[in-house]
Amino acid sequence: MLAGLLMSGSAFGWGREGHETIAKIADNNLKPSARKVIERYLGDHSIVYYAKWMDEYRHTPEYAVTTKWHVARVDENLVYSPYPEAGDAISAINEAVELLKDYENLPDSTVAVNIKYLLHLVGDMHCPAHVYYLGRNQDYKVKFGGGYIKPVKEM
């Protein structure tokens, strides 16, 4: 249930505006039952509030492992190319979805952080600058919010 609700930032990505926009669309489409479950784990804040959370915490020692999770690679045929050494957005999304299938048997803190991961990473995957195109020049420009955001240069 939690994974389904989410599947419906900065110079290198959406920033707050883009993440909050995507989260607001998800929030507007939540089923009441999903909203109730999410509120149990996120408290008084909506999913929009936590949309950029992962960008704000990835530089802390506790969440440093998530630094490379914000992008995904595709090959010359635009087929997803996993990055198992450090992880990536797709593998992190899949792991969070698998964990949350058993959310009722997980510690509340584990459920909350995985909801936040999904909120953020699904938003990242809707930003062209968060996709690394193997074998291609990464110098394309993506205009957002009146300025250009830079694509991922390497992974």
Annotate the PLM regions.
Residues 12-121, 128-155:
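N-terminal, motif-rich segments that launch catalysis or mediate targeting to/interaction with membranes
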Residues 1-3:
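Sec-dependent signal peptide recognition
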